[in-house]
Amino acid sequence: MKIAVLSRNPRLYSTRRLVEAGTQRGHEMVVIDTLRAYMNIASHKPQIHYRGKPLEGFDAVIPRIGASVTFYGCAVLRQFEMMGVYPLNESVAIARSRDKLRSLQLLSRRGIGLPITGFAHSPDDIPDLIQMVNGAPLVIKVLEGTQGIGVVLCETTQAAESVIEAFMGLKQNIMVQEYIKEAGGADIRCFVVGDKVIASMKRQAKPGEFRSNLHRGGVASLIKITPEERITAIRAAKVMGLSVAGVDILRSNHGPLVMEVNSSPGLEGIEVTTGKNVAGMIIEHLEKNGGPNQTRTKGKG
C-alpha cells in the first residue's frame, strides 16, 4: 500500500515509528507536512497538492494532527477522504474528539462513566456550578488545553471561585470537574486499535503534582487493566468514532471514569513502557480494514 503520514515533523518518535513499521511491512510510506498540503476543491476531481505536485495514488492516510493545527489538518484529511483515500481516523471523529465538551456530552449520552462536569458562561452561576460538582477540591480545565496545560486543582471553594472568575474574565472556555481523590494522581492510558485495547500503562503524577501527563513529569509503568476498564475504553473510542485512540481512565470508587479520548495518541510512552510494537499493530489494522472508499462516512466527508 502507499500510505501518507500527515505530520509536521518527520523526526517525532511517533512519526518515525509509523514510517519504520510500514516500511518493514513492505508499504511505501510518505510523510507529508500537514500545513504544506494545499487543496483544489474542484467538483469532479478533488486534489491535494504538495510542494508544487498533486498527491496521487494513496491507499491510506495516517493523520498525526497536532491540536494547534486541528482545523487545517482536518480539512486536508477530509480532502483525502473525498479522494477515496482510507483514513486511520476520520476527520469528523478527530474534530469531535478535539472538542472536550462535545466529547463528554457524547460519552455521557451513552452512559459511559465520567467525572461530574459543569460548564457555565455567567460569573453569577459560579457558586451553584461549584456545588454541582460536589464542591472543592475540584479541577478546572481550559477546553482548548493539551498535555495538562490549563488544568488547575483548586483545594478550596474560595480558590475555585477566584480561578473560575479569572478564566471567565479572560474569555476562556473552561469546564469544572469533580476531583477524584482516590485516583491518587494516577490515570490509565488505554491504547485502543480497532475493537481491542492493545496496550495500557499507568501514569503516576510526580509528588506534589496531580496531573499525570508524561509531558508534566508523570512516570509511566505497566498495569493490568480490569475487564470493566477494557470495555469502557473500547466503548469510548467507538462513541467518538475513532479506530485508534488513547483513552485516559481514572480508577474511582464507583468504577472507571473516562477523562479524555485522544485521537492522536503518542507512541513513545506506550511502546517504551510495554515493549509492544504498537506502530506495527496500527499498520496491521490499516492492512485489514483499509481500502478505497472504506471510510465509515464512505468518503462523503
Swiss-Prot record:
Keywords: ATP-binding, Ligase, Magnesium, Manganese, Metal-binding, Nucleotide-binding, Protein biosynthesis. Mn(2+) 1 binds at residues 248, 260. Mg(2+) 2 binds at residues 260, 262. InterPro entries: ATP-grasp (IPR011761), ATP-grasp_RimK-type (IPR013651), ATP_grasp_subdomain_1 (IPR013815), RimK (IPR023533), Rimk_N (IPR041107), Rp_bS6_RimK/Lys_biosynth_LsyX (IPR004666). ATP binds at residues 141, 178-179, 187, 211-213. PANTHER family: RIBOSOMAL PROTEIN BS6--L-GLUTAMATE LIGASE (PTHR21621:SF7), RIBOSOMAL PROTEIN S6 MODIFICATION PROTEIN (PTHR21621). GO terms for cellular component: cytoplasm. Its EC number is 6.3.2.-. GO terms for molecular function: ATP binding; metal ion binding; ribosomal S6-glutamic acid ligase activity. One of its GO terms (biological process) is translation. Belongs to the RimK family. This is Probable alpha-L-glutamate ligase. PROSITE patterns: ATP_GRASP. Mg(2+) 1 binds at residues 248, 260. The keyword Transcription does not apply. Gene3D superfamilies: 3.40.50.20, ATP-grasp fold, A domain (3.30.1490.20), ATP-grasp fold, B domain (3.30.470.20).
